[in-house]
From Swiss-Prot:
Gene designation per UniProt: lipB
SUPFAM superfamilies according to UniProt: Class II aaRS and biotin synthetases
Binding locations of substrate: 71-78, 138-140, 151-153
Residue ranges the record marks as coiled coil: none
Domain BPL/LPL catalytic: 32-207
Keyword Transferase: yes
Pathway stated in the Swiss-Prot or TrEMBL entry: Protein modification; protein lipoylation via endogenous pathway; protein N(6)-(lipoyl)lysine from octanoyl-[acyl-carrier-protein]: step 1/2
UniProt keyword Nucleus, yes or no: no
Family affiliation: Belongs to the LipB family.
Family matches, as Gene3D superfamilies: Bira Bifunctional Protein, Domain 2
Protein's name in the database: Octanoyltransferase
Broadest EC class assigned to this enzyme: transferase
Catalytic site positions: 169
Known function: Catalyzes the transfer of endogenously produced octanoic acid from octanoyl-acyl-carrier-protein onto the lipoyl domains of lipoate-dependent enzymes. Lipoyl-ACP can also act as a substrate although octanoyl-ACP is likely to be the physiological substrate.
Amino acid sequence: MSPDTLIIRQLGLQPWAPVSLAMHQFTDQRNDETPDEIWLVEHLPVFTQGQAGKSEHLLMPGDIPVMQSDRGGQVTYHGPGQQVMYVMINLKRRRVGVRQLVTAIEQTVVDTLAAFSVSANARSDAPGVYVDGKKICSLGLRIRQGCSFHGLALNVDMDLSPFQRINPCGYAGLEMTQLTQQHPGATLAAVQPLLIAHFAHHLAITDIDWREDPSLPFSSLRH
């Protein structure tokens, strides 16, 4: 397989911790010839604290677990009906800068939402993607040895109420929205191919290999 191939793994609904561990192991073990990967996954309910996370932004987590993450940013929520897209790209090999990658991810979401006739925008003062001032997509990355990991979380068709237990991304009173509030009937299955197509376009990637095996043991994901 060519190192230029982009492998897409559809992992279905998974707990956060094992996926995070596998993502770190993939990143630590990859080499210059390892193809880039994107993992599409939904997570069971969890709050994750980024590297800059402050405890005061966790208002009342209640019965939802709080996990520490090494991504950038503050606290956010993951749950069923939210499309998480982990982006593991060798930036050096693809000659992509960090700012260029962030812009590509944000524009990927904007373009995907436009396919549902939803007008969205990124903001320079607050990373992510917004619809009428409400946040619809969170973004958090880390770069290690020239390779990215972590990624985006796009609210599609989920229970948004857990966001009220936190200051999302560290912003008190930040309102959240989701695609089905803007375009009823939207599904993760409809969103996934659009995210991949737009992301590949923005990074000029033409060789894409889709893998669909939600029961795939995480040890098999390691290179």
